[in-house]
Amino acid sequence: MNMKKSVFVLFSLCLALSCDASVWPAVWIGCHAEKSGADLRVAYFRKSAQLNTVPDAHLIRVSADNRYKLFVNGVLVSLGPARSDLSNWNYETVDIAPYLRQGKNTLAAVVWNYGEKRPMAQMGTNEIALLVCADGADPVFNTDWNWQVLTGESYSSLDDFVVPGYYAADRGERFDANNYPWGWQTEQEAPGFDWKQARNLDAAADKGTRDRGGRLLVPRSIPQMEMREVSAGDINLPLTVAPHTRTSVLIDRDSLTNAYLHLTTSG
């Protein structure tokens, strides 16, 4: 009798879990060709759509493999996902209504995948993937083959970065500004970049959906990190870096700051 009760309770829990979970109306999208799975890879995705009116709210759920930055009309609105594993893949829910406008609107995302030599804390696959899905809103921005994708050539791994012994962090990266599609978030990049139709990858599904595996989706359980501009201080000194040389700049902050620098260069 006890065995029957246990089996019935287990069956009931599994049935409830499967009923609550579902396959999403958007799909994971990716590139048509990527570099070796051992390398850092970057791709740019975007989709533009016309809106006759601006809604009071427009909730979307967004995730990527491994990481993403999401822009609406050139404004950064989300960064993620939170650390995940394939059985518990996080997504963020974002209200993009404050960034929309009447007329043409562009959603854009840069997605990067660390490849086989990713940091130990970064789980996932070796394939770039992006997911955007409306949460009760107009599905016009749901990811599918109607999105555009551009394979990035500006970023590469620091393969000559060697640490003796065990090393669990990222290798670091190189950035070549000559190959970067400046203005891509709002379709204002220079001509000549080879944008392609995005490739549909896998169906997107909640954790607990029957007969599904890989990137099982769960809502983010921790808040987004605070991100705001802070001044580096009033420093106005000339600095000349001769060609083919290196220099170092130390900025001493009075408080702990995880800094993402904005550099303005010319030439």
Regions found by a protein language model. Name each.
Residues 22-35, 110-230, 234:
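An acidic-aromatic loop/edge-strand motif
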Residues 9-18:
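Bacterial N-terminal signal peptides
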Residues 1-6:
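Positively charged n-region of N-terminal signal peptides that target proteins for export
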Residues 39-51, 90-95, 243-254:
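Short beta-strands within extracellular/lumenal beta-sheet-rich domains
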